[in-house]
């Protein structure tokens, strides 16, 4: 039997919104992990992904309520807002995947230059590295004042910039891939909501149907 009835459409829409909730939690978790590194915190894209995740959670709750109650007005705004979320999330995901290592290095350089000495030392100890890149003007000063564990074991330590790039590149690829894949499911959500909204609830009074 083809899934085209009222109950089947409602269940499909509810299931899709549960998936949206899981995606929202996933986006927030992965973005928070990348932001928690302390290096990519200045990349506004990660903050944007967190905002998309939170907003997606709210939209999923609205979709669940609208699907459960067959609420015409709520489903209408659900379709409109979900379409806007698709546009925003698609753009953010493409931006995550489009950022190359040179751009990431520029952002890391700019962020490093405005960090306080205590924050730099904390990052150096956390990542067990010294300095940022050889091209930075603060390289010699960072190397001299470095308090990482590797400094006590060897005269040379790996530069923090390389480690930062490795982690930030991984975080951006995960964010971009997950966001891009699930942004297309939002189009499916709009279609399901539109179809379900125009279906007649067999439990309702026929004269009350729009």
UniProtKB/Swiss-Prot annotation:
The keyword Glycoprotein applies. The chain crosses the membrane at residues 13-33, 45-65, 73-93, 174-194. Residues 1-12, 66-72, 195-210 are cytoplasmic. Residues 34-44, 94-173 are extracellular. Signal peptide: none annotated. It comes from the Eukaryota. This is Tetraspanin-31. It comes from Mus musculus (Mouse). The lineage of its organism: Eukaryota, Metazoa, Chordata, Craniata, Vertebrata. The gene is Tspan31.
